[in-house]
Structures are given as structure tokens and as C-alpha cells.
Amino acid sequence: MRDLLLGTTIPSYFSWLGLFPRFLVWFGFLKASFFCSSRNQSAGESGRRLKMKRAREDVHTDTQKRKPEVSSRGETNKLPRTIDALTYLKAVKDIFHDNKEKYESFLELMKEFKAQTIDTNGVIERIKVLFKGYRDLLLGFNTFLPKGYKITLLPEEEKPKIRVDFKDAIGFVTKIKTRFGDDEHAYKRFLDILNLYRKEKKSISEVYEEVTMLFKGHEDLLMEFVNFLPNCPESAPSTKNAVPRHKGTATTAMHSDKKRKQRCKLEDYSGHSDQREDGDENLVTCSADSPVGEGQPGYFRDYENREDTETDTADRTEKSAASGSQDIGNHKSTTKYVGTPINELDLSECTQCTPSYRLLPKDYAVEIPSYRNTLGKKTLNDHLVSVTSGSEDYSFSHMRKNQYEESLFRCEDDRYEMDMLLGSVSSAIKQVEILLEKMNNNTISVDSTICIEKHLSAMNLRCIERLYGDNGLDVMDLLKKNMHSALPVILTRLKQKQEEWARCHSDFQKVWAEVYAKNHHKSLDHRSFYFKQQDSKNLSTKCLVAEVKDISEKKHQEDLLQAIAVRVMPLFTPDLEFNYCDTQIHEDLYLLIKYYCEEICATEQSDKVMKLWITFLEPIFGILSRSQDNLALEDVSKLKNNRELQDACLAVKETASGSNRKHPISPKRLSKDNTKMQGSSSREDVSANIKVKTAQPDKLQDDAAMTNEVIQSSKFVSPKNDQIMEDEGNHMVNAASVEKHELEEGELSPTASREQSNFEVNGQNAFKPLQKVTDNVRSNKDKQSCDKKGAKNKTRAEDDKQENCHKLSENNKTASEMLVSGTKVSCHEENNRVMNCNGRGSVAGEMANGNQGEDGSFAFSERFLQTVKPVAKHLSWPLQASETCSQNDSQVFYGNDSYYVLFRLHQMLYERIQTAKKHSEKKWKAADNTTPDSYPRFMDALYNLLDGSIDNTKFEDECRAIFGAQSYVLFTLDKLVQKFVKHLHSVASDETDTKLLQLHAYENYRKPGKFFDLVYHENACALLHEANIYRIRYSSEGTRLSIQLMNSGNNQLEVMGVAMEPAFADYLQNKCLKSVNDEENHGLFLNRNKKKFTSLDESRGMPVAMERLNIINEMECRMACSSSKVKYVANTSDLLYRSKQGKPNSRVSEILKQRRISRFHIMLNCRLCALPL
């Protein structure tokens, strides 16, 4: 309640302030007395009830019998009695004795009023909330209120109406239709009354009177109808059959009409009288024609809350019920949608008609809008809703990626603003000129008042205002007051500004073009920033080792010892695999590393790095060593008289060197290195296993490229068809030089003769026997001379082998006997054997002279052979020759973390250079490309970056200009090369790494059939102890490098016994591996296939039946020796399929087609002839 509404004046209010604080003092005294005394000090339960009764009687007396005293309190200035305050406070405490918080809240309220932090209206409002539901306390508090203030209880608060909901309204309408089923006029009249009320043509009183007359004799319907009325007047005329109203609806009709009009203003359903035909008649028709349970629910409202804020929901529900658009059955399921707006519905499960629209739920009450004619009903949409696809909480600013794109955006903003300025000033000039022309032609009277807004638009006026800056408003006033004088001056000023802005626009065009040129390519690159940050971390040793460990733990879950137990070749599953498909990149890497070492590193460091590269990395990847390259080039130079060969050499030279590449070669060494480039140009095809047949006359005069490929192969093997083929190892074995008496496999430390028999040297002199063969291939002599020299070489090789076999017979024990007996070879014997091997200076001595270095760490000499003796001298593993895992087309190396990181850095460098080369080739093959190959241009920029000629920014710009936004992986090449060279030097200087190199060289001295992977692994384990061991294998057949961590659980090859239990061995041989005789073989299941070959015997029918049949046996199983249970290995299976037969060519198809046509005609003629005439 407010002061103005209650008529309380300010003087009376302040006069009452002098009385009410006394009541607060009494409250304070009573509070202290009540809280100091315990509850046991009260007079007992019976006394408390008597006092409570007395208090209620006093309150009732004060509120009803003593009302004149309250109204005259202000005049007589009579104070409330002390006993009244005491009784009221006691009553409050007794009522809330179980709810101390409310009592405390009441006392705090009194304190706040005493401190003047709350006014009388605030006290009344809070008392009504605090004592809600306690009618006696609310009315009793009026005793202490000043004049003009009173707490009144509304009729609704005395007795609330019965709560009704949507289902009750539906049931009521259904009951009416059922009750008046025989009297259709009564039901239609009821609907008409509701529609008239909806159109504000009848008040609540009138509706009640008419419904009372309509429901005469149906008192139950009238009583139920009263519950749906908002405020039914107590004075409404009633008949003797009318149901008497309760006190809760004692509200005047005028008040009800006002509230109804207020609700109608919020949502007007119908504003014209002709809507009765569209709305009410439809309602009546649908209700009359529908059966019980499917009719219309009629008019209903939710009258639980009658606040104005809820009228929207009530009106929407009312309209849906009276519109006739849904039946009662549907309305029963719409209760969950009552009051729910469309934007809060969950439409994810609704039918999607288009990407933007969905159908409303079938049980949702659809509102029928007003002012809709027949055409609107046919065309307008009521059931499709646009789905929310975004949110306004997020800004619409573009997600900018980098600073270069920001520059482009700023440039675009400047251009847009400049264009808008020029456009606006041009438009203003045009309109001003038109206006002046009209004034000069007297089209517009000069004496009359001219409205400037009719001739100039708002944009033109704004342009003029901005033209004068701070004085723009004054100019606009002058323009309106004296247009004839101001317009010419403004026009001149506009033209001057237009010329000035045009010059600025022309000058800025150059600046904008420069900004675009500098930032366009950089703006497209949004990954380089993050790549640079992550690349330094990815190149670290810790990150690389952690990567392979994670892969190894996830990939290798099976135990390899199961396969070893059944004497099967261990299944090595690499953790990492990399492809080296382009061998020409190895030459580019060599030149790159060499150039960097010469420019940056010291001479000693450069020599160590390049020696490790030449003697270790290149042989691993099957690249011909530099010394062998020189020998091959000498042979090529002998064939210069061949014109065709000279042309081929020139082409190879141009291909390898490149036209635009910056060569890291001094002028003094230019001719020498150019010759090397010729020899190395054909290395791209080394790993492709190119074979040159020496027995065919037409291949005797091959070109220099093919001849050079044969010479550069790092390992030659002579197969049965007398072909010279390339391999990855460093051994050369002739077909005629195979020994007749081989050593026992697995011997780790042979004598001098056996050492020489098992090992072949990889030096320069090792190429001398092959040199004669290659000379014969390259010469122009006939086939006979080639055959004679080949026979001569074979005879010489056989003599050497006979001598070796004679010496082999003098050995005391074979290698297998040593392994089984466990006899250890003493170091003294080992040294003697190595010395005996060194005594054969015809091989090892010449090799040492050819490859001995300054420090001797990588030289293949006698002293080197003494340091690479086998570390593990005894193995309890009876290895067989068939168990060797080294093949002629692969190289195996066991190393530690340093070598693993070395190969990973090499692979990363190779991959990035390969990426540049692929992008260059792709760009060069484009149809619209007119520029030459961009790869030499890129390499030249990289060399300039390494020697400091350009900085990183220019190098990045050059890469973007060449390859585009995909070139971000090339930005850190200088960091990668620097880290790679530093790591190469670290490996070359480390003692453990050097021993691993020596062990690898020792194992590679074995013949191809004498190399044992397990022996090599055991020696590496003995050397590295607990450190990580990596198996690094390069296969030239597939040009793939595989890396496997050998220390992770199941991958470790531990020595174990392989003895098989006799019972299990008998079961395996007799049951599982027993071959089935022909007599025991049962018939085939597919008999139709057998009939095709019944005319053939087994020997001739089997090849025909197996034609185009492919069988892949990959099913693996494991058998327990104790229980003989078989367990199949997951992800393994056998496969049998027959490949499709090749389609015949068009000529054969045509012949077959003609044959079929002819056979058809013959058959048709026979049938026609057989027909009776």
C-alpha cells in the first residue's frame, strides 16, 4: 500500500511516527524478557491456550468491534494499550514456537523500522508475507498501524477457488456436448456466448446470467462452470435454481470488465464482426459434427494465477480450444506444451522438411491468427518453424588467423572508406549541380522558401556537413537560411575536395598494391607459426625416443618366442617404416651436407662428418661409395669414341647438375665434381635391381647410363641365368666362385683360411675381378671374346676355391660342433686367426691401402679387423643356414639411441626435400605453367640460407612464391641441417658409436649365406648392455627403411631351449604333419567342378584345375605341448581365389559374335523347315 493511494498525508505520517516508536520500545523490552526466561516459565499448556484464545479474542475485538476507535485514533491521540502489544507478541511467539526463524524475522523487522531503514508500507508488505496464512495475526496487526494504514484480506485469500486445468476444461466441454446431445441449439448457444465474450461484446455478468438460464435444470453444470469464470459478480441476478456463489467471487462487474479488456489488449484475436462467420461457425460446425470424445474442448482458461503477466498463455490456450483446429484427443496430449513458446520447443526429433524448417509436434496447439482470409489459409504457413541455427551471444567478427591477414583487412577497410568518400562526394556534387541548374533556369522560384531536404538526400547533407568538420552545423544552418548564396560556395568546395581525394586515392593505390604483394602469400599460411614452435620439440632426442617407445608398446603385443620355439624364422614387425622412392635425393643430400660442413664447420669436424656419411650412411642405403665411383668413371672415359655414349653422358651430366642450381664447389674442383655428377646421375635406378644380360649379343653395346648403373651397384650377385644384378650389401660373389665345401654355419671366429673363405673385402681391389667383366660388357667385341674372358675368369676363380678348400680340411672343429659343445675360443687363438687372415695381403692389405683414413676409426685395415672380433664367443643356439634373416637385397644394422636419432633426422631431411621436389614437379606439369623447373631455384635459395647470403624471412618468402602455402614445412630446414650435422659429428666422435660401426663392418664381411641376424643381435646386446637396441633395416627391393625397438618385452630375442617333448613330437609328426595317401582321400565336395576334368588324369588335370587359382596361406595357430590344444592367432586367415580371365580383344569378340549369330540362324531355319505347311 502506498501513502498517496491510502490518502496518508505527510503531517499525519510524521505525527504517527511519534506513537509507533513506543510500540517498538515495548517490543524491545518484551524481547529481552522473553529470551531471558525459558519456555518452562510459561503457565503450561492449558494456560497458553487460554492466553492464545484471549489474544485472538482481543484481536478480533480490536478489528471488528473497535473499528471506530481505530479510525478516530488520530483525532483522540489514543495510544494502543500495553496489554495489546504484550498479548500480540505472546501470540506470535506461541504460534511460531516451532519456527524460531519466523519469530526472529518479525523482531528484526521491528528493529529495521526503528532504525528508519524501512517505511510503513514496507512493514505492511513484509508482515503480509511473513504472516501469510495466519489471518488472526494479520488482522490483529492493524491495532498498531497509524491512521490511514490497514491490512485487508482479499476474497481470494479468504477462500481460494478450485484449481482447474486444461483437462478439466476439455472434460467440461465434452460433458456439455453429451448432456445436450439431443438439443443442438443449446450447445451452439453456449459456444456463441463464449465467442461474444471473446469479442468483448458481453461482460462476465452477462455471460453468467445467460449461462444460468441456459443450464436451467442442470445445477451441476452451472457449479462446474463457475470454476472457470475469472471473477463472477456476487450481485449477478440469479434464479431459484441458480447455484449460490461463495464469498471468494465478491468483485464488481466493472472491475472484471476492466481486467478482461486489459487482457484483450495484449492479444486481440478478432477485431471485426465478420470474424464470427470464420471462427464461431467453424467452431460450432466442428463441435456438432464430431462424435463424443473427438469434439472441440470449447472455451477454457487457467485461472490458478490471474496476474496480467500470464494472460498471454491463457489467451493462447483459450484460442486453441475455441478455434476448432484440433480435436479433443489431440488436446489431451497438449498439456505439456501449454504456456511453452515455440522458441523453447525441442524440435530436434521433429520431421525436417528443409535444412532450415521443421514441422511442429502434432500435439502442439497451433494458434490461428486473426485477419486471415481464405487465400491466406491456403498459402500461409502455420506448422513449419524455422530452426535456430546460431546464437546472438557470439559476435560476427571474422576469425583472423595471423598478422598478415590483419594487414590485408586494414587495407580493405581503408579502400572501402576511400571509395565511400569518393562516391558520396560525387553524388553530392551531382545533386547540387542539378539544384543550381533549376535555380538558374527559374524552375524553382528564388523568392519562395525552398526545402533543402526535398532536393538533397540525407547522405548528401551528411557529406556537406563532414566537409566542414566542426563548422558543419553552422554551414547547414546557412544553407537552409540563404541557399542561393551558399550553394555555389559549397559546390566549389565539394569539387576541390573531390580532386584532393582522387589524388589521395591514386597515391594509395600503390601503397595498397605493395601491401597486397607483401602479405598475400603470408596471409594464406596459418600453420607455419605453430609448426616452428612444435618442430624444435619434435626434433629433440627425447621426443623421438618417446615416439618409438609408444609405438612399440602399442604394436608389439605378441610374443615372438612362440615362433622361435617351432623353429620358424622370427617374425620381425617394424615399429616405423619410411619409403625412399627417389634415390636421386640422396645425391642432393650429400651435396647439401658437404656444402654446409665446408661453410660452417672446421676442417677436422667436416672430415669426420663426411667420412661417416660416405662409409656408413651411403652404403646402408645402397649408394655406391665415392672411391668405387671414381673407378667406374675411369672405365666410362675409355668409351668416349662412341658418339652415342657421349650424348648419353652429356644428358646424364645435365640432369644431375641442374641448370640453375648453386653448386657448392670451388672453381679448382669444378671439373672433378662435374665428372662425379655424371657418374652419380644414374643412381636413381640403383635400387630398382636393373639386370644386364651378358649372354645376349644385342645387349653388348648398351649405353653409358646402363653400364654405369652396373658399375655403381654396391653388391653384385651372379644368379643362375648369368645376370649381373645389384644388391645392397658390400660383397661381390661370382656364380663360378661358389665353394663346393661350405663351412658350418654359425662359426663366429674362424681360422685364417676360413676367415678368408667366409669374408670378402669391400675395398677397391675387390672390384678388379668384376672390372674385367664390366669391360667386356662395355666393349664392342663379339660374343666369342666375351665368352672366352668369362671362362678365363671362371677358371681362375675355381683354382682359388680349390686352394681354399684344401686349407679348410685342416681345421680342427666345425662351427656347429663349437656351438653344441659350448667350447669357448680363447682370445689368443682369435688374435692368431685374425693375424693369419691379415697375412693374406693380396686381399686385406690392398683393401687397407685403399680405404685407410687419417684417424683410422673407419679404415678397413689389418688393425681394424683386430678390433672387430666377435664380442659374444658362445651361443647355445644351433643356427641353421636357412634361419638367416639377412637377404641379398637388404642391409641390417643394430644401433643405440644415437643411431636411431641419426636415421630419423636423415629421414626427416629426406622427406622435406622430397616434398619440395614433388611440389616442383606438380607445378611444372600444370597446364598453365610457363616457368622452368622450380626445384633448382629452391635448392639455390637453400644454399644461400645456409651460407648466410639471405635471412630466414627472405627464404620463407621465396618458398611461398615457389610452392605456395604448403611450403611451411621447409621453413626450418636450416635448423634441421644444423642439428643433423651436429649429431653426425657426435656419432663420429663417440666411442660406443664407433664400436657399433666396427661391429657392423665385421658382420658385413661375411658372405651372403654366412650372415646371421641373431648372432649380430647378440653381439650388439653384449656391447650395449641395458641400453636401447634398434634394428634398422633397409631393403632396396622396396626402397624402405624399417626401424624396430628390440628391448620392449616380446621383441627381445632371448636364448632359450628348443628341445621338443618326445610325446608331442610324435603327435605332431603322425597326426598333424602326416601326408594323406590317395586311397584315403575322400571325394570332393564340389562334384560339379570334378566333372569338368573327368577326361583328364591327375597329372594333366591338376595344372588345368589350378589355372588362375591363387592360394595365400596366412593362417597361424599355436599348440600347447602339454594339452595339445590349438589356438588360432587373431587377424590371420587363409585365402583362396581365382582371378578373372582376361577379356578377349575386340577382334576375337567380333568373331565369337558372328559365330553365335550364324548358329542362331541355322537353328531358326531348321525350326522353320520342321513346321508343317
Curated annotation (Swiss-Prot):
Residue stretches of biased makeup (Basic and acidic residues): 55-75, 264-276, 301-319, 778-810
Cytoplasm recorded as keyword: no
UniProt keyword Cytoplasm present: no
Annotated stretches, region: Disordered: 40-75, 236-337, 655-697, 740-813
GO cellular component, as recorded: nucleus
UniProt KW keywords: Nucleus, Repeat, Repressor, Transcription, Transcription regulation
Location within or outside the cell: Nucleus
Organism superkingdom: Eukaryota
Bilayer-spanning residue ranges: none
GO molecular function, one term: transcription corepressor activity
Pfam families given in the database record: PAH (PF02671), Sin3_corepress (PF08295), Sin3a_C (PF16879)
Name of the protein described by the UniProt record: Paired amphipathic helix protein Sin3-like 6
Protein's gene: SNL6
